[in-house]
């Protein structure tokens, strides 16, 4: 069964952020939600899974249609080499019988000749050589020994399993889009940090220029600032390259127009969870449970092979002219079929299917254990990332104050330009670190809600 292979693949996803999610849409940017929906419509794997689910639903309808009467219209023309007649002795007997009946009706002795004008009919043919037939047949299964009933239930649960599996596939794609979107937001936030650093360097360049004019600084200090500015340009190019790659990734994932993605400016905001205890059953677990039920009903279907089956049949001839003397114009009947012994095949097939159900039960237990461990791990990771944001906030404050102090000292000739550039570098690093901490905190939120099955999109 295809569901087995797909679920097995899901089971080997890394522990962190490994399972599906279903209560986070209020914190997602509306445009991000739109991108996710476009991605869900575009993704080929999701489309294939939807087709598989639709096929399973058709299987269910096919099983139900077993109880619908089947009506067949028949038409044929046959020409024999000759009419089919009675043998000569039988024909003579039939003619003699006619004569006796005529004499009896006329009230004359049997041994007297036939009265004048008495007509004898030639014996009818058993079958004329030209045969034109038109008929209708009706076949109707009245009782399938519960095979059809169990087949319908098996198909129903298989379709449900594929639907849940499709939801899990959608979750995986949504996570990819959310991650790419947040990474793009991190790039934009980092570019703002570079813009601030560029403003600081511009300010330092103007100060050093005036200091050189007044003989208070050397051209070397200006060269150092120019070098720092070139390093910023290099970083900006790196961020532009990352932005281009991320936009291309979003184009591939969502099918959105590139120019539309280039116009958006995603924001990277801190996202705090109000409640980390809510939890729902994962789509993977639901898919496994439905698959388990499907094979259970399949086993019942195979086991019911020994139960008698009952069917009705009917036949009606529209044309009577060419019917043989032995053909009925219509008939109806009821039949029973009972497979008393099939060499243990049904029993062995049912046993094999039951073992397949045990495999699903084992996978369910394994998945539940993995989910429980994943939730604990993601809760700890979330708390750690929240604390990291608080710590880095203090680092940014300290770096900001340090830069202001050293910059003031430099203006009072108490610190060198190297000290100012070092302080600016540390401030820049602290801000980068802060934006990355926010990104990791958002990622931890997604991973936790994902693990608990409470992330919507």
Q: Predicted regions span which residues?
A:
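Membrane-embedded beta-strand positions in outer-membrane beta-barrel channels/transporters
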Residues: 135-137, 181, 311, 333-335, ...
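Amphipathic alpha-helical coiled-coil segments
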Residues: 48-63, 169, 175-192, 210, ...
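Flexible, surface-exposed loop regions and adjacent strand-edge segments
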Residues: 88-95, 268, 328-333
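Bacterial N-terminal signal peptides
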Residues: 11-22
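Bacterial Sec-pathway N-terminal export signals of envelope proteins
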Residues: 25-86, 216-218, 251-296, 300, ...
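Small/polar (Gly/Ser/Thr/Ala-rich) solvent-exposed segments
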Residues: 47, 70-85, 122-129, 139-168, ...
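Flexible glycine-rich, low-complexity coil/linker segments exposed to the extracellular/periplasmic environment
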Residues: 85-87, 92-126
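Periplasmic alpha-helical coiled-coil/stalk elements that build and connect Gram-negative outer-membrane
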Residues: 1-2, 30-34, 58-60, 164-281, ...
């Amino acid at each position: 069964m295809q569901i087995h292979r797909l679920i097995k693949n899901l089971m080997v996803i890394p522990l962190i952020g490994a399972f599906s999610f279903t209560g986070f849409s209020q914190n997602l940017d509306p445009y991000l939600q739109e991108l996710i929906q476009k991605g869900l419509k575009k993704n080929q794997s999701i489309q294939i899974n939807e087709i598989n689910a639709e096929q399973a639903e058709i299987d269910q309808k096919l099983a139900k249609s077993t109880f619908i009467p089947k009506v067949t219209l028949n038409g044929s023309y046959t020409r024999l080499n000759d009419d089919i007649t009675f043998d000569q002795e039988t024909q003579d007997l039939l003619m003699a019988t006619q004569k006796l009946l005529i004499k009896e009706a006329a009230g004359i002795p049997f041994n007297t000749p036939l009265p004048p004008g008495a007509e004898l009919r030639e014996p009818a043919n058993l079958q004329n050589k030209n045969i034109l037939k038109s008929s209708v047949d009706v076949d109707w299964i009245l009782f399938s020994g519960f095979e059809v009933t169990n087949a319908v239930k098996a198909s129903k649960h298989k379709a449900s399993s594929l639907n849940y599996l499709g939801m899990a596939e959608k979750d995986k794609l949504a996570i990819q889009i959310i991650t790419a979107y947040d990474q793009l937001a991190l790039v934009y936030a980092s570019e703002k940090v570079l813009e601030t650093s560029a403003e600081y360097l511009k300010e330092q360049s103007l100060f050093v220029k005036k200091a050189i004019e007044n003989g208070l600084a050397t051209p070397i200090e200006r060269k150092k600032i120019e070098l720092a500015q070139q390093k910023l340009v290099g970083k900006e190019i790196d961020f532009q390259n990352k932005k281009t790659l991320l936009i291309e990734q979003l184009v591939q994932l969502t099918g959105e127009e590139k120019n539309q993605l280039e116009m958006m400016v995603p924001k990277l905001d801190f996202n705090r969870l109000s409640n980390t205890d809510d939890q729902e059953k994962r789509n993977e677990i639901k898919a496994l449970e439905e698959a388990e039920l499907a094979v259970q009903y399949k086993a019942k279907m195979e086991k019911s092979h020994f139960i008698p089956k009952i069917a009705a049949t009917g036949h009606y001839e529209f044309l009577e002219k060419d019917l043989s003397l032995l053909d009925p114009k219509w008939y109806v009947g009821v039949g029973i079929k009972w497979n008393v012994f099939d060499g243990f095949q049904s029993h062995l097939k049912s046993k094999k299917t039951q073992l397949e159900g045990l495999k699903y039960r084992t996978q369910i237990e394994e998945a539940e254990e993995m989910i429980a461990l994943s939730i604990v791990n993601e809760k700890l990771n979330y708390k750690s990332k929240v604390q990291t944001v608080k710590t880095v906030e203090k680092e940014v404050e300290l770096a900001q104050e340090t830069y202001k102090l050293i910059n003031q000292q430099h203006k009072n000739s108490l610190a060198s330009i190297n000290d100012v550039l070092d302080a600016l570098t540390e401030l820049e690093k602290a801000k980068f670190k802060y934006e990355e901490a926010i990104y990791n905190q958002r990622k931890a939120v997604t991973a936790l809600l994902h693990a608990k099955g409470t992330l919507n999109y």
